[in-house]
Curated annotation (Swiss-Prot):
InterPro entries: CinA (IPR050101), CinA-like_C (IPR036653), CinA_C (IPR008136), CinA_KH (IPR041424), Competence-induced_CinA (IPR008135), MoaB/Mog-like_dom_sf (IPR036425), MoaB/Mog_dom (IPR001453). PANTHER family: NICOTINAMIDE-NUCLEOTIDE AMIDOHYDROLASE PNCC, NMN AMIDOHYDROLASE-LIKE PROTEIN YFAY. Transmembrane segments: none annotated. This is Putative competence-damage inducible protein. It comes from the Bacteria. Belongs to the CinA family. Signal peptide: none annotated. Disulfide bonds: none annotated. SUPFAM superfamilies: CinA-like, Molybdenum cofactor biosynthesis proteins.
Length: 423
Protein backbone atom coordinates (compact mmCIF):
# COMPACT_ATOMS: atom_id res chain seq x y z
CA UNK A 1 0.00 0.00 0.00
CA UNK A 2 1.50 3.31 -1.15
CA UNK A 3 0.10 6.54 0.26
CA UNK A 4 0.53 10.17 -0.71
CA UNK A 5 -0.21 13.23 1.39
CA UNK A 6 -1.39 16.44 -0.26
CA UNK A 7 -1.51 19.60 1.85
CA UNK A 8 -3.82 22.18 0.29
CA UNK A 9 -3.40 25.84 1.17
CA UNK A 10 -1.49 28.82 -0.15
CA UNK A 11 -0.60 29.75 3.44
CA UNK A 12 1.62 26.64 3.61
CA UNK A 13 3.54 27.63 0.49
CA UNK A 14 4.04 31.20 1.72
CA UNK A 15 5.33 30.03 5.10
CA UNK A 16 2.47 31.50 7.11
CA UNK A 17 1.82 28.14 8.76
CA UNK A 18 3.87 24.99 9.27
CA UNK A 19 2.50 21.73 7.88
CA UNK A 20 2.48 19.73 11.12
CA UNK A 21 -0.30 17.54 9.72
CA UNK A 22 2.19 15.76 7.46
CA UNK A 23 4.24 14.47 10.38
CA UNK A 24 1.14 13.40 12.30
CA UNK A 25 -0.38 11.58 9.33
CA UNK A 26 2.90 9.89 8.41
CA UNK A 27 3.18 8.51 11.93
CA UNK A 28 -0.40 7.25 11.83
CA UNK A 29 0.11 5.60 8.45
CA UNK A 30 3.29 3.92 9.74
CA UNK A 31 1.32 2.48 12.64
CA UNK A 32 -1.09 0.95 10.12
CA UNK A 33 1.69 -0.45 7.95
CA UNK A 34 0.93 1.98 5.12
CA UNK A 35 3.99 3.43 3.39
CA UNK A 36 3.94 7.16 2.68
CA UNK A 37 6.14 7.70 -0.38
CA UNK A 38 5.22 11.26 -1.32
CA UNK A 39 4.21 14.51 0.38
CA UNK A 40 3.05 17.47 -1.68
CA UNK A 41 1.91 21.00 -0.88
CA UNK A 42 -0.25 22.94 -3.33
CA UNK A 43 -1.93 26.33 -3.21
CA UNK A 44 -5.62 27.17 -3.41
CA UNK A 45 -5.79 26.84 -7.18
CA UNK A 46 -8.08 24.40 -8.97
CA UNK A 47 -5.85 23.80 -11.99
CA UNK A 48 -2.75 23.06 -9.94
CA UNK A 49 -4.70 20.95 -7.44
CA UNK A 50 -6.14 18.88 -10.30
CA UNK A 51 -2.63 18.33 -11.60
CA UNK A 52 -1.38 17.19 -8.20
CA UNK A 53 -4.34 14.80 -7.73
CA UNK A 54 -3.76 13.35 -11.20
CA UNK A 55 -0.09 12.69 -10.47
CA UNK A 56 -0.86 11.18 -7.07
CA UNK A 57 -3.48 8.87 -8.55
CA UNK A 58 -0.94 7.49 -11.01
CA UNK A 59 1.61 6.49 -8.36
CA UNK A 60 -0.30 5.88 -5.11
CA UNK A 61 -3.10 3.65 -3.84
CA UNK A 62 -4.17 6.01 -1.06
CA UNK A 63 -4.35 9.77 -1.55
CA UNK A 64 -4.97 11.91 1.53
CA UNK A 65 -5.84 15.58 1.05
CA UNK A 66 -5.70 17.99 4.00
CA UNK A 67 -7.20 21.46 4.07
CA UNK A 68 -9.49 23.44 1.83
CA UNK A 69 -12.78 22.22 3.34
CA UNK A 70 -13.89 25.58 4.73
CA UNK A 71 -16.70 27.92 3.65
CA UNK A 72 -14.74 30.40 1.53
CA UNK A 73 -14.37 30.45 -2.25
CA UNK A 74 -10.72 29.43 -2.10
CA UNK A 75 -11.62 26.24 -0.18
CA UNK A 76 -11.61 24.02 -3.26
CA UNK A 77 -10.54 20.55 -2.15
CA UNK A 78 -13.84 18.65 -2.23
CA UNK A 79 -15.03 20.48 -5.32
CA UNK A 80 -11.81 19.77 -7.20
CA UNK A 81 -11.62 16.12 -6.19
CA UNK A 82 -15.28 15.66 -7.17
CA UNK A 83 -14.49 17.18 -10.56
CA UNK A 84 -11.52 14.83 -11.01
CA UNK A 85 -13.63 11.78 -10.06
CA UNK A 86 -16.56 13.05 -12.16
CA UNK A 87 -18.92 12.88 -9.23
CA UNK A 88 -21.40 15.28 -7.68
CA UNK A 89 -21.29 16.84 -4.25
CA UNK A 90 -24.17 15.93 -1.95
CA UNK A 91 -25.16 17.02 1.54
CA UNK A 92 -24.41 14.82 4.53
CA UNK A 93 -27.41 14.79 6.85
CA UNK A 94 -25.40 14.64 10.07
CA UNK A 95 -23.15 17.52 8.98
CA UNK A 96 -26.19 19.59 8.02
CA UNK A 97 -27.70 19.02 11.44
CA UNK A 98 -24.47 20.14 13.07
CA UNK A 99 -24.59 23.35 11.04
CA UNK A 100 -28.20 23.90 12.14
CA UNK A 101 -27.30 23.36 15.79
CA UNK A 102 -24.26 25.64 15.55
CA UNK A 103 -26.05 28.59 13.94
CA UNK A 104 -29.20 28.20 16.05
CA UNK A 105 -27.26 29.86 18.87
CA UNK A 106 -26.15 32.78 16.69
CA UNK A 107 -27.67 35.67 14.79
CA UNK A 108 -29.50 34.57 11.61
CA UNK A 109 -27.29 36.88 9.55
CA UNK A 110 -24.18 34.95 10.59
CA UNK A 111 -25.17 31.98 8.41
CA UNK A 112 -24.38 32.52 4.74
CA UNK A 113 -24.79 30.23 1.71
CA UNK A 114 -21.05 29.56 1.78
CA UNK A 115 -21.40 27.79 5.13
CA UNK A 116 -23.43 25.03 3.49
CA UNK A 117 -20.33 23.90 1.56
CA UNK A 118 -18.91 22.53 4.80
CA UNK A 119 -21.68 19.91 4.98
CA UNK A 120 -21.01 18.54 1.49
CA UNK A 121 -19.38 15.21 0.67
CA UNK A 122 -18.51 13.58 -2.63
CA UNK A 123 -21.29 11.33 -3.85
CA UNK A 124 -20.66 7.73 -2.81
CA UNK A 125 -18.13 8.57 -0.11
CA UNK A 126 -18.15 7.59 3.55
CA UNK A 127 -18.55 10.77 5.64
CA UNK A 128 -15.95 11.37 8.35
CA UNK A 129 -17.70 13.39 11.10
CA UNK A 130 -15.91 16.44 12.45
CA UNK A 131 -16.30 16.48 16.24
CA UNK A 132 -14.45 19.74 16.80
CA UNK A 133 -15.45 21.74 13.71
CA UNK A 134 -18.08 22.07 11.00
CA UNK A 135 -16.38 20.77 7.83
CA UNK A 136 -17.14 17.08 7.28
CA UNK A 137 -14.40 14.87 5.85
CA UNK A 138 -14.79 11.90 3.55
CA UNK A 139 -13.41 8.58 2.25
CA UNK A 140 -14.07 7.16 -1.20
CA UNK A 141 -12.54 4.44 -3.37
CA UNK A 142 -12.69 4.76 -7.16
CA UNK A 143 -10.96 2.40 -9.61
CA UNK A 144 -8.91 0.81 -6.84
CA UNK A 145 -7.60 4.10 -5.47
CA UNK A 146 -8.82 5.45 -2.14
CA UNK A 147 -9.13 9.18 -1.51
CA UNK A 148 -9.46 10.90 1.87
CA UNK A 149 -10.35 14.54 2.48
CA UNK A 150 -9.57 16.01 5.88
CA UNK A 151 -9.85 19.50 7.41
CA UNK A 152 -6.67 21.56 7.70
CA UNK A 153 -6.73 22.77 11.33
CA UNK A 154 -4.87 20.18 13.47
CA UNK A 155 -7.49 20.54 16.22
CA UNK A 156 -10.05 19.18 13.74
CA UNK A 157 -7.83 16.83 11.74
CA UNK A 158 -6.34 14.85 14.62
CA UNK A 159 -9.63 13.75 16.24
CA UNK A 160 -11.05 12.89 12.82
CA UNK A 161 -8.01 10.77 11.99
CA UNK A 162 -7.85 9.03 15.37
CA UNK A 163 -11.56 8.37 15.79
CA UNK A 164 -12.79 7.98 12.21
CA UNK A 165 -10.06 7.40 9.64
CA UNK A 166 -7.76 5.01 11.52
CA UNK A 167 -10.57 2.54 12.39
CA UNK A 168 -11.78 2.73 8.79
CA UNK A 169 -8.34 2.08 7.30
CA UNK A 170 -7.73 -0.72 9.81
CA UNK A 171 -10.72 -2.55 8.34
CA UNK A 172 -9.67 -1.84 4.76
CA UNK A 173 -6.04 -2.90 5.02
CA UNK A 174 -3.93 -5.38 6.97
CA UNK A 175 -2.97 -3.91 10.31
CA UNK A 176 0.54 -3.36 11.54
CA UNK A 177 0.64 -3.93 15.30
CA UNK A 178 3.10 -1.74 17.15
CA UNK A 179 4.47 -1.16 20.63
CA UNK A 180 6.44 1.97 21.52
CA UNK A 181 9.12 1.71 24.22
CA UNK A 182 10.28 4.96 25.81
CA UNK A 183 13.76 5.62 27.21
CA UNK A 184 15.29 8.47 29.20
CA UNK A 185 18.94 8.74 30.18
CA UNK A 186 20.44 7.27 27.02
CA UNK A 187 21.09 8.87 23.63
CA UNK A 188 19.89 7.49 20.32
CA UNK A 189 23.42 6.73 19.10
CA UNK A 190 24.25 4.63 22.17
CA UNK A 191 20.90 2.85 22.11
CA UNK A 192 21.37 1.96 18.44
CA UNK A 193 24.92 0.76 19.18
CA UNK A 194 23.78 -1.44 22.04
CA UNK A 195 21.03 -2.96 19.89
CA UNK A 196 22.93 -2.93 16.58
CA UNK A 197 22.66 -6.67 15.94
CA UNK A 198 18.89 -6.61 16.46
CA UNK A 199 18.46 -3.58 14.20
CA UNK A 200 20.77 -4.79 11.42
CA UNK A 201 19.22 -8.28 11.30
CA UNK A 202 15.58 -7.28 11.79
CA UNK A 203 12.88 -8.88 9.67
CA UNK A 204 9.64 -9.23 11.60
CA UNK A 205 9.15 -7.66 14.08
CA UNK A 206 10.88 -4.48 12.95
CA UNK A 207 12.67 -1.99 15.21
CA UNK A 208 12.62 1.74 14.50
CA UNK A 209 14.47 4.17 16.82
CA UNK A 210 13.34 7.79 17.05
CA UNK A 211 15.21 10.60 18.79
CA UNK A 212 13.07 13.16 20.58
CA UNK A 213 14.14 16.13 22.67
CA UNK A 214 15.77 14.61 25.73
CA UNK A 215 14.61 11.04 25.14
CA UNK A 216 14.49 8.15 22.67
CA UNK A 217 11.72 5.81 21.57
CA UNK A 218 11.79 2.40 19.92
CA UNK A 219 8.82 1.37 17.81
CA UNK A 220 8.48 -2.42 17.59
CA UNK A 221 6.12 -3.48 14.79
CA UNK A 222 4.78 -6.72 13.39
CA UNK A 223 2.17 -7.88 10.91
CA UNK A 224 0.22 -10.77 12.35
CA UNK A 225 -3.27 -12.20 12.28
CA UNK A 226 -4.49 -10.70 15.53
CA UNK A 227 -3.58 -8.65 18.60
CA UNK A 228 -2.85 -11.70 20.76
CA UNK A 229 -0.19 -13.02 18.39
CA UNK A 230 1.26 -9.53 18.03
CA UNK A 231 1.48 -9.11 21.81
CA UNK A 232 3.37 -12.40 22.07
CA UNK A 233 5.90 -11.56 19.34
CA UNK A 234 6.45 -7.99 20.51
CA UNK A 235 6.68 -9.05 24.14
CA UNK A 236 9.41 -11.58 23.36
CA UNK A 237 11.43 -8.99 21.44
CA UNK A 238 10.96 -6.40 24.19
CA UNK A 239 12.33 -8.80 26.81
CA UNK A 240 15.40 -9.46 24.67
CA UNK A 241 16.05 -5.76 24.12
CA UNK A 242 15.66 -4.75 27.76
CA UNK A 243 18.04 -7.50 28.87
CA UNK A 244 20.91 -5.67 27.16
CA UNK A 245 23.26 -3.32 29.02
CA UNK A 246 24.34 0.22 28.18
CA UNK A 247 27.97 0.96 27.31
CA UNK A 248 28.47 1.86 30.99
CA UNK A 249 27.15 -1.55 32.05
CA UNK A 250 23.79 -0.28 33.27
CA UNK A 251 20.79 -2.53 32.48
CA UNK A 252 18.82 -1.06 29.60
CA UNK A 253 15.70 -1.72 31.64
CA UNK A 254 16.89 0.98 34.06
CA UNK A 255 16.57 3.72 31.42
CA UNK A 256 13.26 2.38 30.08
CA UNK A 257 10.31 4.19 31.60
CA UNK A 258 7.09 3.37 29.78
CA UNK A 259 5.05 2.60 26.70
CA UNK A 260 3.07 4.52 24.14
CA UNK A 261 3.39 7.19 21.48
CA UNK A 262 1.59 9.79 23.61
CA UNK A 263 3.14 8.86 26.96
CA UNK A 264 5.68 10.99 28.83
CA UNK A 265 7.82 11.06 31.95
CA UNK A 266 5.44 13.65 33.36
CA UNK A 267 2.42 11.41 32.81
CA UNK A 268 4.15 8.38 34.34
CA UNK A 269 5.09 10.47 37.38
CA UNK A 270 1.62 11.96 37.72
CA UNK A 271 0.00 8.51 37.61
CA UNK A 272 2.36 7.21 40.30
CA UNK A 273 1.56 10.19 42.52
CA UNK A 274 -2.15 9.45 42.14
CA UNK A 275 -1.61 5.72 42.68
CA UNK A 276 0.19 6.23 45.98
CA UNK A 277 -1.87 9.22 47.08
CA UNK A 278 1.17 11.49 47.37
CA UNK A 279 1.28 15.26 47.00
CA UNK A 280 4.08 17.24 45.42
CA UNK A 281 5.30 20.82 45.27
CA UNK A 282 8.13 22.53 43.45
CA UNK A 283 10.42 25.52 43.75
CA UNK A 284 11.77 26.51 40.36
CA UNK A 285 14.47 28.90 39.29
CA UNK A 286 15.76 28.42 35.72
CA UNK A 287 12.61 26.53 34.61
CA UNK A 288 10.37 29.34 35.88
CA UNK A 289 7.33 27.16 36.56
CA UNK A 290 7.67 24.71 33.65
CA UNK A 291 7.63 21.68 35.96
CA UNK A 292 4.50 22.90 37.72
CA UNK A 293 2.79 23.93 34.49
CA UNK A 294 3.43 20.50 32.98
CA UNK A 295 2.07 18.75 36.05
CA UNK A 296 -1.01 20.96 36.13
CA UNK A 297 -1.82 20.10 32.49
CA UNK A 298 -3.15 16.68 33.53
CA UNK A 299 -6.83 16.42 34.46
CA UNK A 300 -7.09 15.76 38.18
CA UNK A 301 -3.79 17.47 38.96
CA UNK A 302 -5.34 19.04 42.07
CA UNK A 303 -5.28 15.59 43.68
CA UNK A 304 -1.50 15.74 43.89
CA UNK A 305 -0.53 19.40 43.46
CA UNK A 306 -1.74 22.38 45.49
CA UNK A 307 0.86 24.95 44.56
CA UNK A 308 4.51 25.87 44.49
CA UNK A 309 7.09 28.59 43.96
CA UNK A 310 8.96 30.35 41.18
CA UNK A 311 12.03 31.95 42.75
CA UNK A 312 14.19 33.22 39.92
CA UNK A 313 16.52 35.55 41.79
CA UNK A 314 18.65 34.87 44.83
CA UNK A 315 16.66 37.44 46.80
CA UNK A 316 13.35 35.71 46.01
CA UNK A 317 14.78 32.38 47.11
CA UNK A 318 15.57 33.98 50.45
CA UNK A 319 12.30 35.90 50.76
CA UNK A 320 9.80 33.29 49.55
CA UNK A 321 11.49 30.13 50.78
CA UNK A 322 13.20 31.45 53.89
CA UNK A 323 16.69 30.38 52.82
CA UNK A 324 19.53 32.32 54.52
CA UNK A 325 20.71 34.96 52.04
CA UNK A 326 24.31 34.84 53.24
CA UNK A 327 24.42 31.06 52.76
CA UNK A 328 22.98 31.44 49.28
CA UNK A 329 25.69 33.97 48.46
CA UNK A 330 28.33 31.68 49.89
CA UNK A 331 27.28 28.53 48.02
CA UNK A 332 25.82 30.21 44.95
CA UNK A 333 22.41 29.66 43.40
CA UNK A 334 23.84 26.98 41.09
CA UNK A 335 24.69 24.48 43.81
CA UNK A 336 23.57 21.36 45.58
CA UNK A 337 23.06 23.40 48.76
CA UNK A 338 20.58 25.72 47.07
CA UNK A 339 18.74 22.92 45.25
CA UNK A 340 18.31 20.88 48.42
CA UNK A 341 17.29 23.91 50.47
CA UNK A 342 14.71 24.95 47.88
CA UNK A 343 13.18 21.47 47.74
CA UNK A 344 13.02 21.06 51.51
CA UNK A 345 11.61 24.51 52.19
CA UNK A 346 9.00 24.15 49.47
CA UNK A 347 7.90 20.85 51.01
CA UNK A 348 7.74 22.27 54.54
CA UNK A 349 5.92 25.46 53.53
CA UNK A 350 3.21 23.63 51.58
CA UNK A 351 2.96 20.43 53.61
CA UNK A 352 3.46 18.30 50.49
CA UNK A 353 4.87 14.78 50.64
CA UNK A 354 7.53 15.55 48.04
CA UNK A 355 9.38 18.75 47.24
CA UNK A 356 11.28 19.25 43.99
CA UNK A 357 13.58 22.07 42.96
CA UNK A 358 15.40 23.15 39.83
CA UNK A 359 18.20 25.70 39.79
CA UNK A 360 20.94 26.22 37.24
CA UNK A 361 22.17 27.97 34.12
CA UNK A 362 19.79 28.01 31.17
CA UNK A 363 22.32 29.89 29.05
CA UNK A 364 23.70 31.02 26.79
CA UNK A 365 26.08 32.77 29.22
CA UNK A 366 27.89 31.28 32.19
CA UNK A 367 26.71 31.97 35.74
CA UNK A 368 28.85 31.73 38.88
CA UNK A 369 31.60 30.23 36.68
CA UNK A 370 29.25 27.37 35.79
CA UNK A 371 28.75 26.61 32.07
CA UNK A 372 25.38 26.88 30.38
CA UNK A 373 23.35 23.73 30.86
CA UNK A 374 24.53 23.10 34.43
CA UNK A 375 21.48 22.17 36.50
CA UNK A 376 21.01 21.05 40.09
CA UNK A 377 17.77 19.25 40.93
CA UNK A 378 16.76 18.76 44.53
CA UNK A 379 14.25 16.33 46.00
CA UNK A 380 12.97 16.30 49.55
CA UNK A 381 10.74 13.82 51.37
CA UNK A 382 10.01 13.34 55.04
CA UNK A 383 12.97 10.97 55.33
CA UNK A 384 15.55 12.33 52.92
CA UNK A 385 16.87 15.39 51.10
CA UNK A 386 19.09 14.83 48.07
CA UNK A 387 20.17 16.44 44.82
CA UNK A 388 21.66 15.55 41.47
CA UNK A 389 23.77 17.57 39.06
CA UNK A 390 23.18 17.26 35.34
CA UNK A 391 24.99 18.93 32.45
CA UNK A 392 22.82 19.58 29.41
CA UNK A 393 25.48 20.84 27.03
CA UNK A 394 25.22 22.05 23.46
CA UNK A 395 21.52 22.86 23.72
CA UNK A 396 19.41 25.95 23.30
CA UNK A 397 18.08 27.80 26.33
CA UNK A 398 14.62 26.37 25.59
CA UNK A 399 15.93 22.81 25.41
CA UNK A 400 17.97 23.16 28.62
CA UNK A 401 14.86 24.19 30.55
CA UNK A 402 12.74 21.42 28.99
CA UNK A 403 15.29 18.64 29.51
CA UNK A 404 15.93 19.81 33.08
CA UNK A 405 12.22 19.37 33.71
CA UNK A 406 12.41 15.83 32.31
CA UNK A 407 15.24 15.04 34.73
CA UNK A 408 13.13 16.35 37.61
CA UNK A 409 10.15 14.20 36.68
CA UNK A 410 12.42 11.18 36.29
CA UNK A 411 13.92 11.78 39.73
CA UNK A 412 10.46 11.87 41.30
CA UNK A 413 9.38 8.82 39.29
CA UNK A 414 12.33 6.77 40.54
CA UNK A 415 11.61 7.82 44.12
CA UNK A 416 8.00 6.67 43.79
CA UNK A 417 9.08 3.37 42.22
CA UNK A 418 11.30 2.71 45.23
CA UNK A 419 8.21 3.21 47.37
CA UNK A 420 6.36 0.75 45.14
CA UNK A 421 9.06 -1.88 45.65
CA UNK A 422 8.75 -1.53 49.43
CA UNK A 423 5.02 -2.28 49.44
Amino acid sequence: MKAELIAVGTEILTGQIVNTNAQFLSEKMAELGIDVYFQTAVGDNEERLLSVITTASQRSNLVILCGGLGPTKDDLTKQTLAKYLRKDLVYDEQACQKLDDFFAKRKPSSRTPNNERQAQVIEGSIPLPNKTGLAVGGFITVDGISYVVLPGPPSELKPMVNEELVPLLSKQYSTLYSKVLRFFGIGESQLVTVLSDFIENQTDPTIAPYAKTGEVTLRLSTKTENQALADKKLGQLEAQLLSRKTLEGQPLADVFYGYGEDNSLARETFELLVKYDKTITAAESLTAGLFQSTLASFPGASQVFNGGFVTYSMEEKAKMLGLPLEELKSHGVVSAYTAEGMAEQARLLTGADIGVSLTGVAGPDMLEEQPAGTVFIGLATQNKVESIKVLISGRSRLDVRYIATLHAFNMVRKTLLKLENLL
